[in-house]
Amino acid sequence: MTYPNLLDRFLTYVKVNTRSDEHSTTTPSTQSQVDFATNVLIPEMKRVGLQNVYYLPNGFAIGTLPANDPSLTRKIGFISHMDTADFNAEGVNPQVIENYDGGVIELGNSGFKLDPADFKSLEKYPGQTLITTDGTSLLGADDKSGIAEIMTTIEYLTAHPEIKHCEIRVGFGPDEEIGVGANKFDAEDFDVDFAYTVDGGPLGELQYETFSAAGAELHFQGRNVHPGTAKGQMVNALQLAIDFHNQLPENDRPELTEGYQGFYHLMDVTGSVEEVRASYIIRDFEKDAFEARKASMQSIADKMNEELGSDRVTLNLTDQYYNMKEVIEKDMTPITIAKAVMEDLGITPIIEPIRGGTDGSKISFMGIPTPNIFAGGENMHGRFEYVSLQTMERAVDTIIGIVAYKG
């Protein structure tokens, strides 16, 4: 189905810079997200027909569309995030490519281009309307496509009361891209049976497995002396960091793994001979494998300290989120419904693990099973990001089908 306001709504949203800031100590992490929620989203939530609309101190804009059929007793939530990833989000100037011809798309005058030879996903979209960047910023389809789709769903249902639906709760939240947005989510206040994050990629994505995730902060304490007299005295912290890294499995890196394979990822190293700090992330799907990865890092640190005769290697491990499959597989109702709706719409469900996390990873463990459905974005988090308008329309169709489902 086509929705006349969907494209303009999306273009309005992406032109607002809502980049999050991982170094901030506030919630939301940037004032621009507060302004976007209070000045743009909340007024529009009221205009499209949501009731009991309010903004919480945790950064979430919340609203409700009451059920219009007493036989549909479920309460279902839909959640998307306002922030965009760590890439330029100022001066977003989207290009609208109607009836895409399957060829190369020049991204404004930037010198960058979307070429099917480099981005095979483009082969799916001839004849469709694509929204791209101008090459100077990201687009923000992650996740403003989701926000636009949810808002358009509410607008359509309000205008078409003949479509019977259950109670719908909507939540637009902050700071998903920096991994903290759902930390303060108020599950009791949201009060639904289950929810969906509308934060996926291409048409048909339906996901209920995420990584389990941890962060590892390492400190290597060296002893710097003049290299000319260093023998037997110097302890080079840089070499300690290298030795530690070399004891990790050499093939367990993001660039060498896929599917259900986990990894260690060295994110950052700073330091000198005297001391080094290194940051890793640890990812795996199975709980035992996840715990084993953390234990392995601790074992390497302990062994090095024993061999060095002092505690020169300090490791701090912090769990970040867990595989939501552990919660959702106890009651697959949200997956069963979404799958049935997609199939009824002629959409092939793509049920694969997310090699990452979503707000749903944390919200599921707060008592609201929250799988993820497609929002349409491709090549997210950079200048090559784009989205198909037709995929966004199909996302709206899917949300409508979910809330009207009577099975």
From Swiss-Prot:
Positions bound to Zn(2+) 2: D142, E177, H381
Cofactor needs: Zn(2+)
A GO MF term: zinc ion binding
PROSITE patterns hit by this protein: ARGE_DAPE_CPG2_1, ARGE_DAPE_CPG2_2
List of residues binding Zn(2+) 1: H81, D142, D199
Co-factor remark: Binds 2 Zn(2+) ions per subunit.
Catalysed reactions, as listed in the record: Release of the N-terminal residue from a tripeptide
InterPro entries reported in the protein's UniProt record: ArgE/DapE_CS, Bact_exopeptidase_dim_dom, Peptidase_M20, Peptidase_M20_dimer, Peptidase_M20B
UniProt-listed Gene3D superfamilies: 3.30.70.360, Zn peptidases
Active site annotation, chain numbering: D83, E176 (proton acceptor)
Cellular localization per UniProt: Cytoplasm
Keywords carried by this UniProt record: Aminopeptidase, Cytoplasm, Hydrolase, Metal-binding, Metalloprotease, Protease, Zinc
GO biological process: peptide catabolic process; proteolysis
Annotated Gene Ontology cellular component terms: cytosol
The protein's Enzyme Commission number: 3.4.11.4
Highest taxon, organism lineage: Bacteria
Family note: Belongs to the peptidase M20B family.
Biological role stated in the UniProt entry: Cleaves the N-terminal amino acid of tripeptides.
Stated name of the protein: Peptidase T
Species of origin: Streptococcus pneumoniae (strain JJA)
